[in-house]
Amino acid sequence: MHVTLVEINVHEDKVDEFIEVFRQNHLGSVQEEGNLRFDVLQDPEVNSRFYIYEAYKDEDAVAFHKTTPHYKTSVAKLESLMTGPRKKRLFNGLMP
């Protein structure tokens, strides 16, 4: 299992817009055949910080995800909402 934890920091006045943009990515991602989990989390202490927990069955599923319209649209719209680049950490999922 391929797991990615992504940290996304957005401008404080763009929080609602981020949530709507990412909702579309979430709804599309959970429909992908190789997707096992796609959680969107908001930091309770920093309202403009989000974490995305993505689990895919393998690298091929991740590669497919990055070709989807919902992913490409989301990434394009995120650039103007973020305070800096996304931070990604990769994990091997052992016990889901």
UniProtKB/Swiss-Prot annotation:
Role of this protein: Involved in the degradation of phospho-AI-2, thereby terminating induction of the lsr operon and closing the AI-2 signaling cycle. Catalyzes the conversion of (4S)-4-hydroxy-5-phosphonooxypentane-2,3-dione (P-DPD) to 3-hydroxy-5-phosphonooxypentane-2,4-dione (P-HPD).
Name listed for the protein in its UniProt record: (4S)-4-hydroxy-5-phosphonooxypentane-2,3-dione isomerase
UniProt GO MF annotations: (4S)-4-hydroxy-5-phosphonooxypentane-2,3-dione isomerase activity; oxidoreductase activity
The keyword Isomerase appears for this protein: yes
GO cellular component, one term: cytosol
Matches recorded under SUPFAM superfamilies: Dimeric alpha+beta barrel (SSF54909)
Taxonomic lineage: Bacteria, Pseudomonadati, Pseudomonadota, Gammaproteobacteria, Enterobacterales
Keyword annotations: Cytoplasm, Isomerase
HAMAP family in UniProt: LsrG
The ABM domain, residue ranges: 2-91
Family, per entry: Belongs to the LsrG family.
Signal peptide: none
Record text on subunit structure and interactions: Homodimer.
Pfam families the UniProt entry points to: ABM
EC number: 5.3.1.32
Subcellular location: Cytoplasm
Catalytic activity: (2S)-2-hydroxy-3,4-dioxopentyl phosphate = 3-hydroxy-2,4-dioxopentyl phosphate
